[in-house]
Amino acid sequence: MQNEFRVCDDCQATNLKTLLPRLKKLDPNATIEIGCQSYCGPGRKKVFAFVNNRPVSAMTEDELIEKIAAKLKK
């Protein structure tokens, strides 16, 4: 099954310029969907991504990438 990442292009805590290349590095074959994820409350304060329809968030992008990598290994 192919992994899917969904990220918001409008949330204040998310920097797509740095996050997208890192997600592609984690899984080059994953589908990446960019757009509003209706996760605005947490998205103001935390970096987040939906990984296979499950939200993953962290205070920093580095922490987020670590959490996503761990989730993909399961």
Swiss-Prot record:
Pfam family for this entry, one: DUF1450
Entries under InterPro entries matching the protein: DUF1450 (IPR009910), UPF0741 (IPR020880)
HAMAP family associated with the record: UPF0741
Family to which the UniProt record says this protein belongs: Belongs to the UPF0741 family.
The protein's name: UPF0741 protein Aflv_2757
Species for this entry: Anoxybacillus flavithermus (strain DSM 21510 / WK1)
